[in-house]
Regions:
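Basic/polar N-terminal segments that are highly enriched at the extreme N-terminus
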Residues: 1-10
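Acidic/histidine-rich alpha-helical segments that form the ligand environment
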Residues: 83-131, 148-150
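Hydrophobic alpha-helical core bundles mediating ligand binding, dimerization, or RNAP-core interactions
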Residues: 16, 20, 27, 110, ...
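Short, contiguous alpha-helical
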Residues: 9, 13-24, 34-89, 132-175
Length: 175
């Protein structure tokens, strides 16, 4: 057994990177039609999932770090034709179905949000991890707990994306 302590920043980054690799692999080569595929009228499409996952990472890492969200600061909201405060939390099935963003813009934001989130997390201090922040439910909790939730959501959503890809492409798409 080693005495090396696990660095929380590196651990969170490893989880974020794993889900980003999964969603990148699962979306590679998909058409616009496939990105918008919904198995039922009340399920999330891949395009919406990758956007929402990225918005949530950007919003939470910005809150914890005290930096502005790139969604607004870098004009992604405007390019996507959406309000700056929209994250996908609470979107209705109709909003999910209506979600359409040009592929290059969507994946431009997805990549930018991933990279800025990793950068922010790499620079967080122990004090920032224990600071209380208000969650989307209104609950005050330490930033590390919210970060754990973001990692869990990222894993769930990247898994949903991979599942949808499998539904469309069948066995062997990951080769």
């Amino acid at each position: 057994m080693t005495s090396d302590a696990v660095n929380l920043n590196q651990f969170i980054i490893a989880l974020l990177e794993a889900s980003y690799r999964s969603l990148t692999q699962a979306t590679e080569g998909l058409t616009d039609e496939q990105l918008s595929y919904q198995p039922t009228a009340e399920t999330n499409a891949i395009a919406w999932l990758v956007w929402h996952l990225s918005r949530w990472r950007d919003a939470i890492s910005a809150t914890i770090s005290g930096e502005p969200q790139i969604w607004v600061r870098e004009g992604w909201a405007e390019r996507c034709g959406m309000p700056g405060e929209r994250t996908g939390m609470g979107d209705t099935p109709a909003q999910v179905t209506a979600f359409r963003v040009e592929r290059s813009v969507l994946f431009g934001y997805v990549g930018a949000a991933h990279h800025v989130t990793v950068e922010r997390v790499s620079n967080l201090t122990p004090t920032q991890f224990v600071q209380p922040i208000v969650s989307h439910t209104g609950e005050r909790r330490p930033a590390w707990r919210t970060s754990a939730g973001v990692c869990g959501d990222s894993a769930q959503h990247s898994g949903q994306i991979a599942y949808l890809r499998g539904l469309m492409s069948g066995y062997g798409w990951r080769r």
